[in-house]
Amino acid sequence: AARAEFTVLHLVTGAHAVRALLPWLHAADRLPALRHYAGAAAAAWATLPREHNGAPLQVTVLPWTEITARATLSDDDHVIKLVDACRELEASQGGAVWSRAASRAVAEIA
């Protein structure tokens, strides 16, 4: 489980990094950069364990103020990086998946 969490952490923070860096690349380099990231992300995703029943894990989605407050209490800098990346990705792309992932990351921190 720890290996899977490590992989997911880097998929999310990698997506955040690509989004942040794309505007700085020459236009001709953007599509190749996305293709390279997509290939790496697909390879990493393929290594992750799958739930047998296909049902999503239950998680209480917290408001961002609570998520960030809990993240700052963590002694694991990976939690803070993941929460920051999720917050930035939700702000730029929308979708509740980011707050759901961040809520799961801080679920054990109170």
Which residues make up each language-model segment?
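Mature, well-folded catalytic/scaffold domains that follow N-terminal targeting or propeptide regions
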Residues: 1-110
